[in-house]
């Protein structure tokens, strides 16, 4: 990773102490700033250092599917459910549609989820990875926040990735400790571009094209990487003038399209004009 040593060291330092004190961290930043990359590197570190790593990611099309996010997260450890007290076991199984019970109280679900995680962590420390938390369903958001506030006595670390400047229920995660992820500085941006150019091959980019990409990307790692690749594919002939729009890729359009779609209708209308 380029420009993320401080954040990575913050995460791994906290993770090495979870046997004494568990914790949760919310990695907060703009689209494309590298939240997923940081979480992936942290998960790989944890996997190599004796942790069981559990993953989930919010999906925009599943925000109305109750408990979908936390079911994906804890599905691999559901074998520990029989060790829970009866009322917790029933609550959890009912929430996941695995028992014919009335939908339980959200508090009971939170307590049961915490109990399941603690039971699994008694055998091996856990690293819980929650990416794109802004797209979790409301019930999963409630559980993740509930559990994140109560990990101090468990050998568990929870990492959540959350987009900055959000409204709505996802902001409840901001009650947890935050780790802001900003843009890259000029040297880091140039280093990333050089690595992308080297990886893509071909004729690279002219100095003027490189300056244009760095200026428009403004330190956003995804923008730097994707604009560089798009320009190499298109060729420098696309750089007719400073007023010529840079070619983009589907990946970068998708990242910022989701941010656009999350805006209220009046704001979307204004930006579309």
Residue spans for each PLM region:
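Winged-helix-like regulatory helical subdomains adjacent to P-loop NTPase cores
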Residues: 5, 22, 243-273
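P-loop NTPase Walker A phosphate-binding motif
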Residues: 30-64, 79
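Conserved Walker-type P-loop NTP-binding/catalytic site
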Residues: 67-127, 155, 179, 190-194, ...
